[in-house]
UniProtKB/Swiss-Prot annotation:
Tissue-by-tissue expression: Expressed by the skin glands.
Organism: Leptodactylus labyrinthicus (Labyrinth frog)
Family, similarity comment: Belongs to the frog skin active peptide (FSAP) family. Ocellatin subfamily.
Main location: secreted
Listed name of the protein: Ocellatin-LB2
Leader sequence residues: none
Keyword Lyase: no
Any single Gene Ontology cellular-component annotation: extracellular region
GO biological process, one term: symbiont-mediated hemolysis of host erythrocyte
Keyword vocabulary terms for this entry: Amidation, Amphibian defense peptide, Antibiotic, Antimicrobial, Secreted
Modified residues (Asparagine amide): 23
Function: Antibacterial peptide that inhibits the Gram-negative bacterium A.actinomycetemcomitans ATCC 29522 (MIC=210 uM). No activity against the bacteria E.coli ATCC 25922 and S.aureus ATCC 25923, or the fungi C.albicans ATCC 18804 and C.lusitaniae ATCC 56936. Does not show hemolytic activity towards rabbit erythrocytes.
Localization: Secreted
Length: 23
């Protein structure tokens, strides 16, 4: 549902930010 989509997007954003910080 919509909540699952939002959770997935949040995880993707968090992953991108984390990868930028780690580099």
């Amino acid at each position: 549902g919509v909540v699952d989509i939002l959770k997935g997007a949040a995880k993707d954003i968090a992953g991108h930010l984390a990868s930028k910080v780690m580099n």
